[in-house]
Amino acid sequence: MQKVLGRIQAQVLRSRATNALANVVRHEATSSRTAAKPAATSKEFRERQVRFNIKNEQTEGRPLYLDAQATTPMDPRVLDAMLPYLTNFYGNPHSRTHAYGWETESAVEKAREQVATLIGADPKEIIFTSGATESNNIAVKGVARFYGTKKRHVITTQTEHKCVLDSCRALENEGFKVTYLPVLANGLIDLQQLEETITSETSLVSIMTVNNEIGVRQPVDEIGKLCRSRRVFFHTDAAQAVGKVPLDVNAMNIDLMSISGHKIYGPKGVGALYVRRRPRVRLEPIQSGGGQERGLRSGTVPAPLAVGLGAAAELSLREMDYDKKWVDFLSNRLLDRISSALPHVIRNGDAKATYNGCLNLSFAYVEGESLLMALKDVALSSGSACTSASLEPSYVLRAIGTDEDLAHSSIRFGIGRFTTVEEVDYTADKCIKHVERLREMSPLWEMVQEGIDLKTIQWSQH
């Protein structure tokens, strides 16, 4: 046991040094806006970062990681906060008769305050869950079912996360009416269309803050204002936005908000649901049990995970401006490097109303899966990790009007807190190299080079 704890302690110390070095690298790169000085330092940082894992095992040779929308690495400072509650402080936070329960309950309540502070809420409005998927299910199904005797209409969009869409389909099977609003070509909703869709039967509008595939940021403040004026509850899936962009549930008139721990450098298996108390939002719980979390989510709160989520929330609030500058710098660098070297590269989604850490590009005349296979030394994806097993083109890209060929050629680049200049440059250069190689093998690319408009060709069917 002592050897294990010794290895963990050594890893924590090593992680602290790594994180401090990363902060220095980010500061130098952001202030100078050049890669000259940070490039050498970031190489040293990367070597330190991937050399050991928590078990003190060597991990050299793993791919670079640019898939921050799927998940983020846990911040070492979050692990520091969690470790005592994985070892010494193991009491059940709901045990009110002894010190073991009291000390753990105190830690959970502190975490609740940290999450609430991040979004401008009251701690009593924070419900701990297993993640954003559960939070979305509770919010969408819970509100609809509670008010279902009088209101049977729910509004969402065609580009929501799959768990929201599937929750809405489940409600349709129960007899509810659901309107799936289309989005504009830039991925944003039409506010006038939303206003016209709300009726006296509408109980809930559920629209995500930042899209997990194309990074588009919806005007949640305007949506919230509209919903409040029409006395309709507004839920937003903010898993990709919390901790990355400023959010205030009161200023934005948000009634319910879903949060994920592992999207903000916290642990997996924990999330939160913000539920407004004034004006009060009523929910029907989707599971039965001991009535924990204000009776809305039964089950023992996992104290170590809750503590980790709280620590991640506090760090995100403290470093949000700093992280934004770093992510913007790297995202612009990646986009400029690729688009200046390759023609026919299309950015999917609005270029301004966006979170730059999620950059979705389509490379015309290249099959996206082929490009991903060629970039095997970089961890990337062609869309949501929750639907990555499907070979069908992204439903989000189809919803914004992207044709099937371009949808199949899309790659999502996820940039985060610990991404380095060297990683971005390496990825861009590899991407350019392989796109050029794959296009040389494409007869369609050859025809385009000869000036042939492919849209004018009548293709024969075989």
Swiss-Prot record:
Could you tell me the superkingdom of the organism this chain comes from? Eukaryota
Pfam families noted in UniProt: Aminotran_5
* Binding residue positions for pyridoxal 5'-phosphate: A132, T133, N212, Q240, S260, G261, H262, T300
Where do the catalytic residues lie?
C386
Q: Which PROSITE patterns match?
A: AA_TRANSFER_CLASS_5 (PS00595)
* Compartments where located: Mitochondrion; Nucleus
The entry's [2Fe-2S] cluster-binding residues are: C386
For this protein, the record's InterPro entries field holds: Aminotrans_V_dom (IPR000192), Aminotrans_V_PyrdxlP_BS (IPR020578), Cys_deSase_IscS (IPR010240), Cysteine_dSase (IPR016454), PyrdxlP-dep_Trfase (IPR015424), PyrdxlP-dep_Trfase_major (IPR015421), PyrdxlP-dep_Trfase_small (IPR015422)
Q: Kindly state which keywords UniProt assigns to this record, in alphabetical order.
A: Iron, Iron-sulfur, Metal-binding, Mitochondrion, Nucleus, Pyridoxal phosphate, Transferase, Transit peptide
Q: What is its EC number?
A: 2.8.1.7
Chemical reaction(s) catalysed: (sulfur carrier)-H + L-cysteine = (sulfur carrier)-SH + L-alanine
Kindly list the cofactors needed: pyridoxal 5'-phosphate
Residues annotated as carrying N6-(pyridoxal phosphate)lysine in the record are K263
Record GO biological process: [2Fe-2S] cluster assembly; iron-sulfur cluster assembly; mitochondrial tRNA thio-modification
Please give the activity regulation comment for this entry.
Active when in complex with bcn92/Isd11/Lyrm4. L-cysteine binding kinetics are reduced in the presence of bcn92/Isd11/Lyrm4 and IscU. Activity is regulated by other components of the mitochondrial core iron-sulfur cluster (ISC) complex; Activity is reduced in the presence of IscU but enhanced when both IscU and fh/frataxin are present.
Q: Which GO terms describe its cellular component?
A: cytosol; mitochondrial [2Fe-2S] assembly complex; mitochondrial matrix; mitochondrion; nucleus
What top-level class of enzyme does the UniProt entry assign? transferase
A GO molecular function term, named singly, is: sulfur carrier activity
**Tissue expression as described in the entry:** Ubiquitous expression at high levels in any life stage.
Matches recorded under HAMAP family = Cys_desulf_IscS
- Similarity comment: Belongs to the class-V pyridoxal-phosphate-dependent aminotransferase family. NifS/IscS subfamily.
Q: What is the annotated role of this protein in its UniProt record? A: Catalyzes the removal of elemental sulfur from cysteine to produce alanine. It supplies the inorganic sulfur for iron-sulfur (Fe-S) clusters.
Q: What is this protein called?
A: Cysteine desulfurase, mitochondrial
